Amino acid sequence: MIIPVRCFTCGRPLGHLYPIFKRRVLAGERPGEVLDSLGVYRYCCRRTLLSHVEWIDDVLAYERRS
């Protein structure tokens, strides 16, 4: 839902890489090559970035209002 700040497994900071990763993948680059060029080689960190889904806008539609 919210961009992961750190890898869930090893704790490496990843939050600063996600906007770059997303922009380049949407521009048509292959995700694996983008991660390699960003220096993300551990499979746990790659998983964290590759599997992230932005659902925050969908979840906010169900926000309770007092």
From Swiss-Prot:
Q: Which reaction does it catalyse?
A: RNA(n) + a ribonucleoside 5'-triphosphate = RNA(n+1) + diphosphate
The record's subcellular locations are:
Cytoplasm
Its EC number is 2.7.7.6
Segment forming the signal sequence: none
- GO molecular function of the protein, one example? DNA-directed RNA polymerase activity
Per its UniProt record, the required cofactor names are: Zn(2+)
Q: Which PROSITE patterns match?
A: RNA_POL_N_8KD (PS01112)
Q: Name one GO cellular component term.
A: cytoplasm
Which InterPro entries does the record associate with it?
RNA_pol_su_RPB10, RNA_pol_suN_Zn-BS, RPABC5/Rpb10
User: Cofactor comment in the record?
Assistant: Binds 1 zinc ion.
Q: What is its main location?
A: cytoplasm
Q: Which Gene3D superfamilies match?
A: Homeodomain-like
* EC category: transferase
Binding-site positions, Zn(2+) = C7, C10, C44, C45
Q: Which UniProt keywords apply?
A: Cytoplasm, DNA-directed RNA polymerase, Metal-binding, Nucleotidyltransferase, Transcription, Transferase, Zinc
How is this protein organized at the quaternary level? Part of the RNA polymerase complex.
> What does it do?
DNA-dependent RNA polymerase (RNAP) catalyzes the transcription of DNA into RNA using the four ribonucleoside triphosphates as substrates.
Q: What family does the database annotate?
A: Belongs to the archaeal Rpo10/eukaryotic RPB10 RNA polymerase subunit family.
Report the protein name in the record.
Answer: DNA-directed RNA polymerase subunit Rpo10
Q: Which gene encodes it?
A: rpo10
